[in-house]
Design a protein with these regions (language model features):
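Short, charged surface segments at domain edges that flank catalytic/cofactor-binding sites
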Residues: 1-31, 54-62, 158-159, 163, ...
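Alpha-helix initiation and capping sites
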Residues: 58-65, 91, 113, 141, ...
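C-terminal, charged low-complexity interaction regions
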Residues: 123-230
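A generic structural signal for short, solvent-exposed coil/turn residues
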Residues: 24, 37-40, 89-91, 97, ...
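Histidine-centered nuclease catalytic patch
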Residues: 13-14, 34-67, 75-97
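PEST-like low-complexity intrinsically disordered regions enriched in Ser/Thr/Pro and acidic residues
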Residues: 76, 80-86, 91-96, 100-129, ...
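Generic recognition of cysteine residues
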Residues: 32-35, 74, 209, 215
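Phosphate-binding glycine-rich loops of NTP-binding sites
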Residues: 70
Length: 230
């Protein structure tokens, strides 16, 4: 899950929270802040604290992220305790989750018991642990939830790009791969598959607008986020 920085609130604020959609997409790109899919239309302005339970934050810039319909629906409107979860705008979430062959997501190894609980809770909250064949029937996706399929397809696509890079490395090819990644989304998958190459890691960080640069060191390696739990 890509760590993001939305930047300062636009001058004048918002009379209607839906008006924040365009500024958010300008700041963060047209990607779901949770599953990372590129969503060209109908992106929801996501309230981190549900608007029904914390109406005071209805139009608060710092309470906004972007969400696809699947992540938004899974998260719902139930009151939550922010400290029980990990958030891409306050934590270095790229360190908390591991993307694996086939596009599966799991808590990253070695993150410690406290962060592990938060990572597991975050996956359950957003339904990121849902995939066909899950031993728990409640954690299998509906027919309308194709996030797992998108991750699998992007993993395969990224692996092909990696193979081309290893076979015929060039600046032009590196730029083309980043262009493809930015157009398709799923930062975490690209960062995992191309993570062996520091230059490509840095190009991904630079290419995906709104990526929090404080979450990476000079070698483009993920580091603890200042003020975050990871």
């Amino acid at each position: 899950m890509r760590p993001v920085h939305r930047g300062p609130a636009p001058a004048g604020g918002f009379a209607n929270y839906r008006d924040a959609a365009t500024p958010l997409m300008t700041a963060l790109g047209d990607y779901c802040s949770y599953c990372e899919r590129q969503i060209p239309t109908h992106m929801a302005v996501e309230h981190i604290q549900p608007k029904s339970s914390v109406p005071a934050l209805l139009t608060s810039w710092t309470n906004f992220l972007l969400a696809c319909g699947n992540c938004n629906s899974c998260k719902g409107h139930v009151p939550i305790a922010l400290a029980d979860y990990l958030w891409p705008d306050t934590d270095n979430t790229i360190r908390a989750f591991e993307y694996k062959l086939g596009g599966l997501i799991e808590p990253a190894p070695g993150i410690g018991p406290l962060v592990l609980l938060k990572a597991q809770a975050t996956m359950r909250l957003l339904g990121l642990d849902k995939y066909p064949g899950n031993p728990d029937p409640a954690r299998r996706p509906t027919d309308a939830d194709l996030r797992w399929q998108h991750r699998r397809q992007l993993w395969d696509f990224a692996e092909k790009a990696k193979a081309r890079l290893l076979a015929n490395d060039s600046i032009q090819l590196r730029e083309q791969i980043i262009d493809s990644a930015v157009l398709r989304g799923s930062f975490g998958i690209w960062f995992t598959v191309l993570g062996f190459d520091a230059d490509m890691r840095q190009r991904l960080i630079n290419g995906f607008c709104g990526t929090s640069t404080t979450c990476f060191n000079a070698a483009a390696t993920p580091i603890p986020r200042p003020g975050g739990v990871i």
